[in-house]
From Swiss-Prot:
GO terms for cellular component: chloroplast thylakoid membrane. Its EC number is 7.1.1.-. This is NAD(P)H-quinone oxidoreductase subunit J, chloroplastic. The lineage of its organism: Eukaryota, Viridiplantae, Streptophyta, Embryophyta, Tracheophyta. Keywords: Chloroplast, Membrane, NAD, NADP, Plastid, Plastoquinone, Quinone, Thylakoid, Translocase, Transport. It catalyses: a plastoquinone + NADH + (n+1) H(+)(in) = a plastoquinol + NAD(+) + n H(+)(out); a plastoquinone + NADPH + (n+1) H(+)(in) = a plastoquinol + NADP(+) + n H(+)(out). It is a peripheral membrane protein. Pfam families: Complex1_30kDa. NDH is composed of at least 16 different subunits, 5 of which are encoded in the nucleus. PANTHER family: NADH DEHYDROGENASE [UBIQUINONE] IRON-SULFUR PROTEIN 3, MITOCHONDRIAL (PTHR10884:SF14), NADH DEHYDROGENASE UBIQUINONE IRON-SULFUR PROTEIN 3 (PTHR10884). The gene is ndhJ. NDH shuttles electrons from NAD(P)H:plastoquinone, via FMN and iron-sulfur (Fe-S) centers, to quinones in the photosynthetic chain and possibly in a chloroplast respiratory chain. The immediate electron acceptor for the enzyme in this species is believed to be plastoquinone. Couples the redox reaction to proton translocation, and thus conserves the redox energy in a proton gradient. GO terms for molecular function: NADH dehydrogenase (ubiquinone) activity; quinone binding. InterPro entries: NADH_DH_suC (IPR010218), NADH_quin_OxRdtase_su_C/D-like (IPR037232), NADH_UbQ_OxRdtase_30kDa_su (IPR001268), NADH_UbQ_OxRdtase_CS (IPR020396). Belongs to the complex I 30 kDa subunit family.
Length: 158
């Protein structure tokens, strides 16, 4: 079933794939990395003025990485604002996705966390560096194929 935003994107010739609706009835769309920046700008102009959250996950061992964006249209006098979930998949070998920092400033720390944990590079992000792990950390801890370093000391329980 195609949602309202998906129908609008089709009408305007914008390439995407509808993934249906989540359990709350929020429309979910898949956008290719090369199309994401231009569609993000269009969504902002269309009224999706709030990036509620951005996260990322490892789809499967050796598979794709996903960056997920939850956008909301906040309008005066509207009790139930329209929401959409956008998923952008990137190859594990060189995961690059355009940053939306310049569209929604709230993407700053969220994209940095996704970079730090999964190694997704957000092109044009002004400060893309580790935010949780030390700068010297090797690897991406939330990837399913991550092998934890063998240097942790077991602390005495006393």
């Amino acid at each position: 079933m195609q949602g309202r935003l998906s129908a609008w994107l089709v009408k305007h010739g914008l390439v995407h794939r509808s993934l249906g609706f989540d359990y709350q009835g929020i429309e979910t769309l898949q956008i290719k990395p090369e199309d994401w920046h231009s569609i993000a700008v269009i969504l902002y102009v269309y009224g999706y003025n709030y990036l509620r959250s951005q996260c990322a996950y490892d789809v499967a061992p050796g598979g794709l990485l996903a960056s997920v964006y939850h956008l909301t249209r906040i309008e005066y006098g509207v009790d139930q604002p329209e929401e959409v979930c956008i998923k952008v998949f990137a190859p594990r070998r060189n995961p690059r996705i355009p940053s939306v920092f310049w569209i929604w400033k709230s993407a700053d720390f969220q994209e940095r966390e996704s970079y730090d944990m999964l190694g997704i590079c957000y092109d044009t992000h002004p400060r893309l560096k580790r935010i949780l792990m030390p700068e010297t950390w090797i690897g991406w801890p939330l990837r399913k194929d991550y092998i934890a370093p063998n240097f942790y000391e077991i602390q005495d329980a006393h």
